[in-house]
């Protein structure tokens, strides 16, 4: 008997929750809790609070940048709409990995203006296209920053990053899977294009794909393109400062006292890479990757590295939850009035 879609989604979510639990367990089992609590007492909490405030600010800036991609389709899209969409997205992702993106798209489409025929100016397919171009752009920026870090600070980070990428690239299964996905997508697009004029389901599917293409091309129809790049630079500058704030918060602890702004930049990149693993809220994946990097580069024990990883990750989880709650209250009570 085949499972229905709801059951499959529940089982998929439970699987990734289990993965997160296992990752957290392996990270936490080596923690010296007496040392951990002592570190919390020595922590400069004003920097942690500053990092959380910067986290809320980056949601607003990201929302403004995404709004630039949406405006060619719906000029009425407001900053508060994209800000709320990002906040709700982050909060939903804490519970169900990747579901936040669906919530984000549904939110902006639901708040889109209507044309004279009563249809939404912004449709789901076009919104999805803008989300994809945003993700691709951020991925390219991350790769570019990692490459710059390797070139400029090879002695410190180069060997670790190259070794990590070499280990990833040596997996034949990964390359076969990637090639298979590309071939499948190409074949699917060719079939949809070939049968598009027959109407029915093929016409609808091709229409949806064409809408995604329109969303992807929204970059070329933006006004003030330079502002998009300014927003991007500001976003990553804020992320860097957030990482630096946690480094500064732990300066009174000997294991972290030598860390610099360059080290905070590396930890920011390492943390962004962990988001590829679709566990709820990044639990476990972030902790494991950051602790492993600290052990390899600075010989900081995993149990000690967990102090930084936990403080950085959980402070941002709290920020996401609070921002999501604030947007929910705004949407449910203030905006509807």
Regions inferred by a protein language model and the residue ranges of each:
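Predominantly cytoplasmic-facing regulatory/coupling regions of multi-pass membrane proteins
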Residues: 1-87, 152, 157-274, 315-337
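Alpha-helical transmembrane segments and their lipid-water interface positions
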Residues: 54, 62, 66, 93-97, ...
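Membrane-interface alpha-helices at helix entry/exit sites of multi-pass transporters
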Residues: 79-82, 99-101, 114-135, 300-311
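Alpha-helical transmembrane segments of multi-pass membrane proteins
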Residues: 85-93, 129-141, 231, 307-316
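Short intracellular "coupling" helices and adjacent cytoplasmic loop segments at the cytosolic face
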Residues: 87-102, 109-117, 216
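Transmembrane alpha-helix interface/packing and boundary motifs in multi-pass membrane proteins
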Residues: 91-97, 266-287
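Re-entrant/interfacial helical elements at transmembrane boundaries that shape
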Residues: 101-112, 279-296
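C-terminal transmembrane helix pair
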Residues: 277-278, 289-337
């Amino acid at each position: 008997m085949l499972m229905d879609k709801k059951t499959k989604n529940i089982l998929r979510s439970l699987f990734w929750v289990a993965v997160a639990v296992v990752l957290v367990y392996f990270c936490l089992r080596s923690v010296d809790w007496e040392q951990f609590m002592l570190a919390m007492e020595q922590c400069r909490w004003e920097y942690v609070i500053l990092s959380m405030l910067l986290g809320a600010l980056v949601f607003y800036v990201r929302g403004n940048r995404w709004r630039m991609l949406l405006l060619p389709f719906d000029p009425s899209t407001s900053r508060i709409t994209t800000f709320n969409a990002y906040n709700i997205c982050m909060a939903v992702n804490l519970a169900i990995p990747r579901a936040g993106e669906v919530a984000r798209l549904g939110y902006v489409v639901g708040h889109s203006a209507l044309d004279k025929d009563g249809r939404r100016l912004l449709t789901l397919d076009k919104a999805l296209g803008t989300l994809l171009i945003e993700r691709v752009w951020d991925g390219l920026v991350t790769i570019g920053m990692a490459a710059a870090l390797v070139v400029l600070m090879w002695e410190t980070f180069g060997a670790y990053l190259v070794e990590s990428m070499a280990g990833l690239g040596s997996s034949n299964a990964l390359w076969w899977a990637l090639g298979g996905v590309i071939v499948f997508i190409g074949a699917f697009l060719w079939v949809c294009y070939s049968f598009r004029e027959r109407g029915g389901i093929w016409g609808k599917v091709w229409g949806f794909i064409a809408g995604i293409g329109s969303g992807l091309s929204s970059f070329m129809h933006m006004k003030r393109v330079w502002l998009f790049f300014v927003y991007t630079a500001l976003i990553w500058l804020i992320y860097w400062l957030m990482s630096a704030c946690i480094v500064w918060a732990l300066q009174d602890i000997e294991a972290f006292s030598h860390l610099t702004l360059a080290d905070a930049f590396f930890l920011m990149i390492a943390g962004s890479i962990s988001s590829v693993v679709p566990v709820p809220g990044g639990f476990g994946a972030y902790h494991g990757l950051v602790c492993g990097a600290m052990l390899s580069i600075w010989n900081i024990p995993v149990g000690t590295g967990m102090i930084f990883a936990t403080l950085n990750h959980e402070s941002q989880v709290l920020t996401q939850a609070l921002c999501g709650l604030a947007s929910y209250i705004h949407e449910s009570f203030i905006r509807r009035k």
